[in-house]
Amino acid sequence: MASKDWNNMLSGRLYHAQDSELVAARLRARRLVFRYNQSAPENESLRRELARELFGQMGEGCYLEPPLRCDYGSNIRLGDRVYANFNLVVLDCAAVTIGNDVLIGPNVGIYTAGHPVDPGLRRQGLEFALPITIEDGVWIGGHAVIAPGVRIGRNSVIGAGSVVTKDTPANVVAVGNPCRVVRPVTEKDREVWDTGENGEGPLSHGPKANSPG
């Protein structure tokens, strides 16, 4: 049976992170993460096995470059074909749901965890957490930070170094600190590439004007 603090954590209420059940769950995650990060580069089968044990759900064709960090792992649900570059940090004190075909750049932080603004509550050791959802087809650039309670809509692009503190709609490019929508994703983003017959041709006029950073 889950403890009161575990239930409070997953429900967006204040909780004590030093609850014995939470401490034990974090230790379990750290052991699995340690083994994952220390695995030999060629031992992909071991990493897949460890990831399936660590995460609440892991779809087909996922690959997360080590090293990675998370708090619990069990609150993370990955769709199919998720790719994360080096140094992903996920503070999954609340649910983190990542859809299919999501790309995550290096040094990205996904943080469900927060602390009260009131210093008295902080001194009591109270924390809170809010769920994060990253929908299908999203690309998150390197060094971006996703704050508690955020939803990023389908196929959107988050520019490198952005700090996402509010929901981002589907099919947009959003950049900055705080992150703001700068334009929609359109057919021109496909047309910028002169792919030729085999889909591997050179750039027609360069992607820089259309890049999120």
Regions found by a protein language model. Give the residues of each.
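A contiguous, mid-protein "functional segment" used to position or interact
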Residues: 163, 169-181
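Short-chain dehydrogenase/reductase
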Residues: 63, 139, 157, 173-175
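Flexible, glycine/small-residue-enriched loop-and-beta-strand segment within the central core
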Residues: 68-151, 177-195
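Short, glycine/charge-rich beta-strand/loop segments that flank catalytic centers
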Residues: 48-49, 67-69
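Terminal amphipathic alpha-helical/low-complexity segments used for targeting or macromolecular assembly
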Residues: 1-61, 179-213
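Beta-rich strand-turn-strand
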Residues: 141-167
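Short secondary-structure boundary/capping segments
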Residues: 6-7, 54, 124, 131, ...
